Curated annotation (Swiss-Prot):
Family that this chain belongs to: Belongs to the YqgF nuclease family.
Superkingdom: Bacteria
Localization annotation: Cytoplasm
Annotated Gene Ontology cellular component terms: cytosol
SMART domains recorded: YqgFc
Name of this protein: Putative pre-16S rRNA nuclease
Primary subcellular site in the record, as a coarse category: cytoplasm
Length: 161
């Protein structure tokens, strides 16, 4: 298992959930929910600020695939966002399969007694925790980093497609 804190990113249409691991990769905890900024780069800047605050060794972006494994519009959105992150930082960015993370997060919150109205502010953070915990467990079991490394094409984070 590689050492260093990881920051998980659950990309949604309106919000982005963040979760972090401890430096030993044993546990994932929620951090915050960042508003999506489709017209600018405030979301990328905030995520990179959090990554700097926690001395992040790697960013783990959830890749929402259909149950069949096929790409969806959400898959394309997450891949594009991961590229924006990779282009704006030296921190490695990985895409990891996140099938059913939001469904699992909803179930966990429901089981904890949170109704759907109370879930909204934290659902994205809980999904990010599930994504990160899965990535950490996968790395421990396989002995290699999970998912796929996103290639970097350095650009100004304020300039994106």
């Amino acid at each position: 298992m590689r050492l260093g804190s990881r920051l998980a990113v659950d990309v949604g249409k309106a919000r982005i959930g963040l979760a972090r691991s401890d430096p030993h990769g044993l546990i994932a905890t929620p951090v915050e929910t960042v508003p999506r900024d489709p017209a600018g780069s405030a979301d990328v800047r905030r995520i990179l600020a959090v990554a700097t605050e926690i001395d992040c060794a790697e960013l783990v972006v959830g890749l929402p695939l259909a149950l069949s494994g096929r790409a969806t519009a959400s898959t394309d959105d997450a891949e594009g966002f991961a590229r924006r992150l990779a282009d704006a930082t030296e921190i490695p960015v990985r895409l990891v399969d996140e099938r059913l993370s939001t469904v699992s997060a909803q179930g966990a919150l429901r089981a904890s007694g949170r109704g759907s109205r109370k879930q909204k502010p934290v659902i994205d953070q809980v999904a990010a925790v599930i994504i990160l915990q899965h990535a950490l467990e996968t790395e421990r079991a396989a002995g290699s980093p999970p998912g796929a490394l996103v290639p970097r094409n350095r650009v100004d984070p304020d300039r994106h497609a």
